[in-house]
Regions:
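N-terminal nicking endonuclease/strand-transfer module with a His-rich metal-binding environment
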Residues: 1-201
Length: 201
């Protein structure tokens, strides 16, 4: 039996669901991949970053509904403006004020296909404390969305209602400087950099 066949015979079950793969570029992720493989062998899912398909909102009512769902089931709230920091959940008045704050930056004549907001998710391995999820998500958001290049408004809601604690980040796509957010390969906002930031934080 060839070595590769022997290794596959032992590890095939563990890695059948893609545990051995990290999507995107592997630059700078060698240690992260080793950690991922060890956690995978022990039955843990790695940290995951993704933009929610169809998660952008186009109107104030859509945004208010999304915020109602995300921020009334949360255990920690982080607000880029600092006004709502420290809360576990938001009340109806908070959601209304936040919706109005986001909408002030929208251009009435501009109707982006993916919405005026972007909904992103950062999911963490089983056993990660909610406070750690909050702190990591906050650091990642500040690294990308509160920089000299641009200041974007966002709200983070941490959920601990599943095995894998996770942070929902709703981003107002128009920055204070007028830049419009999008995720793209070879763009300053790209999946690889977000994933790497989660590992580094």
């Amino acid at each position: 039996m060839r070595l590769n066949d022997a290794v596959h015979a032992v590890t095939g079950e563990v890695f059948r669901d893609g545990w051995s793969r990290v999507r995107g570029s592997m630059q700078g992720l060698h240690v992260a991949k080793q950690t991922q493989l060890v956690r995978a062998a022990a039955g843990h899912r790695p940290a995951v970053f993704k933009a929610i398909r169809g998660g952008g909102t186009h109107t104030k009512s859509q945004l208010a509904n999304q915020l109602d769902y995300l921020t009334t089931k949360s255990t920690h709230i982080v607000d880029s403006s600092g006004f709502l920091d420290g809360k576990a959940k938001l009340e109806a008045g908070d959601i209304k004020d936040l919706t109005e704050r986001f909408a002030k930056r929208w251009d009435a004549g501009f109707k982006p296909k993916l919405g005026q907001t972007t909904h992103m998710l950062m999911s963490f391995p089983i056993g990660t404390r909610g406070e750690d999820v909050r702190d990591i998500a906050t650091d990642v958001a500040e690294r990308f969305f509160q920089t000299d290049e641009g200041h974007f408004d966002y709200i983070i809601a941490v959920h601990e209602d599943r095995d894998h604690p996770h942070a929902h980040l709703v981003l107002n796509r128009r920055s204070q400087e007028g830049e419009f957010f999008f995720l793209g390969r070879n763009h300053r906002f790209n999946y690889d950099d977000f994933r790497l930031a989660m590992v580094e934080e």
